[in-house]
């Protein structure tokens, strides 16, 4: 009986270790795929690429894109959250988020806002689009709360 119990403990320990290794491999594959997808889609040939994103400057303005990736074990999907800041000379700035399934290319969520000024020159976001799946949102905080299940599970 003692040998049986020791054998069961060993079996669970080995299978737990193997599961952790396979999850780690999936997370690494996700990170690599997200990085390739991000660079291809958001960082053109003229950009300066660093580990956290890419930067492009041209006569019209500046563009900075960053990203994070997450392997969601519950959904068995790899997600890329791209975040862009764009500033055009003499005009508004733009703030853009896109949540994308790396394997299928499906867009799960979008947040796009222009930065404007009110009559007292206070900065405010002018939200052009904010949606996660079929849910509409009204702020960046609401957007971040709605994407949390995709990026934290």
Predicted regions and their residues:
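Sec-dependent N-terminal signal peptides
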Residues: 4-15
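N-terminal export/targeting and maturation segments
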Residues: 18-68
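Processing junctions and N-termini across compartments
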Residues: 24, 72-74, 124, 131
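Sequence contexts marking disulfide-bonded cysteines in secreted/extracellular proteins
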Residues: 29-33, 42-44, 53-55, 77-81, ...
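Cys/His-rich zinc-coordinating "finger/knuckle" motifs
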Residues: 37, 50, 85, 137, ...
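Mature extracytoplasmic domains of secretory-pathway proteins
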Residues: 59-113
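Low-complexity intrinsically disordered segments
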Residues: 109-153
């Amino acid at each position: 009986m003692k040998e049986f119990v020791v054998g069961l403990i060993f079996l669970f320990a080995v299978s737990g270790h193997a599961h952790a290794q396979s999850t780690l491999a999936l997370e690494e594959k996700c990170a690599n795929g997200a990085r390739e997808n991000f660079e291809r889609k958001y960082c053109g040939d003229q950009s300066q690429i660093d580990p956290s994103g890419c930067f492009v400057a041209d006569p019209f303005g500046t563009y900075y894109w960053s990203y994070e990736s997450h392997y969601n074990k519950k959904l068995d999907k790899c997600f890329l959250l791209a975040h862009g800041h764009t500033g055009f000379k003499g005009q508004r700035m733009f703030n853009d988020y896109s949540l994308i399934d790396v394997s299928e290319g499906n867009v799960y969520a979008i947040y796009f806002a222009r930065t404007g000024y009110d009559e007292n020159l206070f900065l405010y976001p002018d939200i052009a689009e904010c949606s996660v799946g079929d849910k509409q949102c009204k702020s960046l905080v609401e957007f971040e709360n709605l994407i949390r299940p995709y990026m934290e599970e």
